Swiss-Prot record:
It is found in: Cytoplasm, Cytoskeleton. The gene is act27. This is Putative actin-27. It comes from the Eukaryota. It comes from Dictyostelium discoideum. Disulfide bonds: none annotated. It holds the Pfam family Actin. Its main location: cytoplasm. The keyword Mitochondrion does not apply. GO terms for molecular function: ATP binding; hydrolase activity; myosin binding; structural constituent of cytoskeleton.
Length: 372
């Protein structure tokens, strides 16, 4: 059934909700994925953030998974009516989901969209698949690292391969914690948002950590605090994002770095697609924005992969918004509406239909699911 309405894209991040219209190059709106409540009212996004001192703040998405549906509904309502100024019943809604989103969560997303917001059709897709679309390819392996969740997901011909998908035990919030500890060691006890700002503006990935950490000529960078005090930060700037590559050195646990996690994921896929995956290693999400990460990833994978392997790291300048942009691109394909689940299907088959559609797609790629 063809639906003559526009489509909107919502990327549901643990830290930030990004919303906008299909065909646009960037989200129309970005706001914190938080709900603030007092005795009488609730506030969403930036308004909740600005009143955080007098509100109880709630975060409905934890480590990429929606855990509070009432508050998530408030965030979607805010995105539709306040940020985009649209009526959801007049728009197809494209939604991102965590690579390891439980089936019951996917059904709940569909239920709220159709029964509460009366949207005519939806499309729910793995965040990593959207990131692949933004790379201009249909096959590759994605490292998506946001504020509270990181995943490695191989994608073959537009379909994520779940048996080789992994969730990493660290993300941007953990890097912020690490930066806070490093700054505390220097005698700076700073608010978390200031620490996060330092991390995002000044940190970088070292090309050779063991050498640079012992190099006395490493130059520090200055940062002006809100009170006007200027502090100088040195090795902490590259020690913080080193968590991505050497998490076990910081957390004391048996965690793989992002390069080793990508290698392990590829090794779980059939041999005949290894070169395709190595040929499009896609970096996605805000925690992949550190300068130097592209070279370090290439260096790490070169040491792990067979010597004749061609490795291509795809680090788009706009990769912080890769998921949203990929959803926007999807909405432009000629048969987009045929891929959607419409209200008629939902009314006939119920919420479980969204999982039946996903299973059908996976069955068409069964040949690439076997482990080596």
């Amino acid at each position: 059934m063809e639906i003559n309405v526009q489509a909107i894209v919502i990327d549901n991040g643990s830290d930030t909700c990004k919303a906008g219209f299909v065909g646009e190059e960037a989200p129309h709106s970005e706001f914190p994925s938080i709900v603030g409540i007092d005795q009488n009212d609730s506030y969403v996004g930036n308004e909740a953030q600005s009143k955080r001192g007098i509100l109880t703040l709630k975060y409905p998405i934890e480590r990429g998974i929606i855990t509070n549906w009432d508050d998530m509904e408030k965030i979607w309502h805010h995105a539709f009516y306040n940020e985009l100024g649209v009526a959801p019943e007049e728009n197809i809604v494209v939604l991102s989901e965590s690579p390891l989103n439980p089936e019951e969560n996917r059904e709940k997303m569909a239920q709220i969209m159709f029964e509460t917001f009366k949207t005519p059709a939806i499309y729910v897709e793995n965040q990593a698949v959207f990131s692949i679309y933004n790379s201009g390819r249909m096959t590759g392996i994605v490292l998506d690292s946001g504020d509270s969740a990181s995943h490695v997901v191989p994608v073959y011909e537009g379909l994520a391969l779940p048996h080789a998908t992994s969730s990493l035990g660290f993300a941007g919030c953990d890097l912020t914690d690490q930066m806070s500890l490093l700054l505390n060691d220097l005698g700076y006890n700073l608010e978390r948002e200031i620490v996060r700002d330092i991390k995002e503006k000044l940190s970088y990935v070292s090309s050779d950590f063991s050498w640079e950490i012992n190099d006395p000529s490493t130059l520090g960078k200055s940062y002006e605090l809100p009170d006007g005090q200027v502090i100088t930060i040195d090795k902490e700037l590259f020690a913080c994002p080193e968590v991505l590559f050497l998490p076990y050195a910081f957390f004391g646990t048996n965690l793989d770095g992002i390069d080793k996690a990508i290698y392990n994921s590829i090794m779980k896929c059939n041999d005949d697609i290894h070169n395709d995956l190595y040929g499009n290693v896609v970096l996605s999400g805000g925690s992949t924005m550190f300068p130097g990460i592209e070279y370090r990833m290439y260096k790490g994978l070169t040491q792990l992969a067979p010597s004749t392997t061609e490795i291509v790291i795809n680090a788009e300048p706009d990769r912080k918004n890769s998921v949203w942009i990929g959803g926007s691109i999807l909405g432009l394909v000629p048969n987009f509406q045929e891929l959607c689940i419409d209200k008629e299907d939902y009314d006939e088959y119920g919420p479980s239909f969204v999982n039946l559609v996903k299973s059908f797609r996976e069955q068409n790629h069964q040949n690439y699911y076997g482990e080596n």
